[in-house]
Amino acid sequence: MLFSEAERSLADFAEKHGIPVAETQAGKSAMPIKHPCYMGSIGVTGSSAANALAQEADVVLAIGTRLQDFTTGSRALFRAEGRKIINLNTQAFDAFKHGGLALIADAKAGLAALDKGLGDYAAPGAWQKQAAAMRKTWAAEHAAAT
């Protein structure tokens, strides 16, 4: 994400398609913290919102990540039956991890191609509302602790 300078592309993609976004520790600042689709970090040190959504998602789009144990909670976050993982990565080795669908491309170019392919698709309204509620709960937890 960061090397591709795809931060704006990610935000636009997430907004258009109603997709919540979590970031890895290495991907910090890929999404503005105040963006309504931003759910915080994922993994061992992740937010309650990001980790819960990852556990419930039917499709996970992983962009530029190695999906290592620190990010996946030793795969605990990605065990739901039938879940599909789409790995968008410039490195084939990382793109094929966890039995996902490998999309080998630059993040910015890959997001543009996915956006074109998805057309006007948006995540179901109930999923978007659930993500927004989880974000609100997480933000309140964070505010109370700081």
Predicted regions and their residues:
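Phosphate/diphosphate-binding loops
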Residues: 43-94
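Aromatic-residue hotspot detector
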Residues: 31, 78-79, 114
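Phosphate/pyrophosphate-binding active-site segments
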Residues: 82, 86-146
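Short amphipathic alpha-helical segments
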Residues: 7-9, 72-76, 98-100, 115
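Short charge-dense sequence patches
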Residues: 5-8, 58-68, 108-116
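Short gly/pro/ser/thr-enriched loop/turn and capping motifs at secondary-structure boundaries
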Residues: 27-32, 68-69, 92-96, 111
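Short, hinge-like loop/turn segments at secondary-structure boundaries
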Residues: 37-42, 80, 103-105
